[in-house]
Amino acid sequence: EDKYISREFQSFGIYLSEELDDYKHRGLYIKLAKTVHRSILEKALSFVADSNAKNKGALFMWKMKQLRVAKDKS
């Protein structure tokens, strides 16, 4: 499986999908890793890691949107 991963953002996208227990949406996380600033993704991931949510992917997307809006306002 790793033979298809040639760039760092792809690796980080796979890492996100595994951490969020959402491997079937790994393409989405690879795209986010390519287009969204890394600090926003890491903050959203740490927020989800500290939570006890059933749907970690949805919580991650919600928090990421909040962080992006806050960044755009400042």
Q: What label would you give each PLM region?
A:
Residues 34, 42-74:
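Short, cationic/aromatic linear interface patches
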